[in-house]
């Protein structure tokens, strides 16, 4: 059973004797992949409950997140190569307790952090987001059913203290809190980030269709969602707006429609120029961060003038020709680390 709190952490760790070796950890993750790809009644119920608890987690987004994890993260060959790249030992001689503060903007967004700690052989102490706790808790409970020793490697806690290291993901405001409490320990603290696309005007209809996915998957709430476009002067937006029409059904979701109506009204009352396709608004704005249902854009005259974007710490990834291919922003690999900070390398220093 999943433990809540840290009171029994040390005793629980000792209870099962021999640690899981690396190959056993990879094997159980392969079993987890099969479980997540299936439709066992308990798993189906957990996904349904997660969708009920958080209206932003519609079933199609939960399935997309699950498919991304099973296809890109849990393949045994990928895991073996990933661990070998960092010389992960079979067993940690002195496993460290690593606190994980997880975000909740999209389903299972904190899974990669959990996976990194688990495959490294350290002990994960997780504080899940209240917006996304059902899925991760169910996954861990299933792992424990597969092998009771997992219960000595993964814990849940309402508050994190007295640990060896911390990985915390949140907003710019919460990051100041994290800095204050976790700053004196080894840490990775992540702040607000978003993604942009550079359009050169030669994109095909198929590429624009894929860009629409990069923009609107998960309602645009992920840090890898494109929320700002850089387009050539005199760019014709009509083909892209047309490609985005496949997401008109988002207006059937009241939280999305509320955002759309509200932000459109602000632009109208402010007498601001905008474009829309009746479900998404384009507004010229220098900020890479845009609200749900709105995407910002800026014009450029020369591609060289955009070189600074690769150094912008607000930007998670750049989509476009010569950058991340269209349609792949929401399909990160094991080594696409959030904020560009190598989580596995960090864990190997503990």
Features from the language model and the residues they span:
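Conserved NAD(P)+-binding/catalytic subdomain of aldehyde/semialdehyde dehydrogenases
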Residues: 6, 14, 146-235, 291, ...
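Conserved small-residue-rich beta-alpha loop and adjacent elements
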Residues: 83-146
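N-terminal Rossmann-like NAD(P)+-binding subdomain of aldehyde/semialdehyde dehydrogenases
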Residues: 2-99, 296-305, 314-325, 332-335
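Donor nucleotide-activated moiety binding/catalytic core segment of transferases
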Residues: 85-105, 157-162, 172, 280-282, ...
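NAD(P)-dependent aldehyde/semialdehyde dehydrogenase
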Residues: 219-350
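Glycine-rich nucleotide phosphate-binding loop and flanking beta-alpha elements
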Residues: 80, 106, 173-175, 237
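Structural signal for hydrophobic packing residues in well-ordered secondary-structure cores
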Residues: 33-40, 70-73, 147, 182, ...
């Amino acid at each position: 059973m999943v433990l809540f709190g840290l009171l029994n952490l040390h005793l629980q760790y000792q209870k099962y004797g021999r640690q899981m070796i690396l190959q056993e950890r990879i094997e159980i993750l392969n079993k987890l992949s099969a479980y997540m790809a299936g439709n066992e009644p308990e798993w189906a119920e957990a996904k349904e409950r997660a969708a009920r608890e958080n209206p932003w987690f519609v079933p199609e987004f939960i399935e997309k997140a699950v498919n991304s994890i099973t296809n890109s993260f849990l393949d045994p060959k990928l895991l073996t190569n990933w661990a070998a790249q960092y010389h992960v030992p079979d067993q940690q001689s002195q496993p460290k307790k690593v606190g994980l503060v997880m975000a909740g903007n999209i389903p299972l967004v904190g899974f990669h952090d959990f996976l990194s700690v688990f495959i490294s052989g350290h002990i994960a102490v997780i504080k899940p987001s209240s917006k996304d706790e059902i899925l991760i808790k169910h996954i861990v409970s299933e792992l424990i059913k597969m092998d009771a020793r997992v219960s000595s490697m993964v814990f849940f806690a309402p508050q994190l203290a007295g640990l060896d290291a911390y990985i915390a993901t949140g907003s710019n405001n919460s990051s100041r809190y994290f800095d204050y409490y976790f700053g004196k320990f080894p840490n990775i603290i992540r702040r607000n980030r978003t993604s942009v696309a550079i359009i050169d005007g030669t994109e095909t209809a198929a590429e624009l269709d894929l860009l629409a996915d990069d923009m609107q998957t998960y309602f645009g709430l992920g840090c890898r969602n494109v929320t700002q476009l850089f387009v050539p002067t005199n760019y014709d937006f009509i083909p892209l707006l047309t490609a985005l029409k496949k997401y008109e059904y988002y207006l059937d979701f009241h939280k999305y429609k509320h955002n759309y109506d509200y932000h459109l009204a602000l632009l109208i009352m402010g007498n601001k120029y905008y474009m829309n396709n009746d479900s998404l608004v384009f507004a010229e704005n220098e900020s890479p961060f845009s609200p749900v249902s709105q995407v910002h854009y800026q014009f450029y005259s020369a591609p060289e003038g955009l070189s600074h974007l690769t150094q912008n710490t607000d930007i998670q990834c750049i989509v476009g020709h010569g950058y991340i291919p269209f349609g792949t922003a929401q399909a990160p690999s094991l080594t696409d680390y959030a904020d560009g900070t190598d989580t596995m390398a960090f864990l190997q220093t503990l």
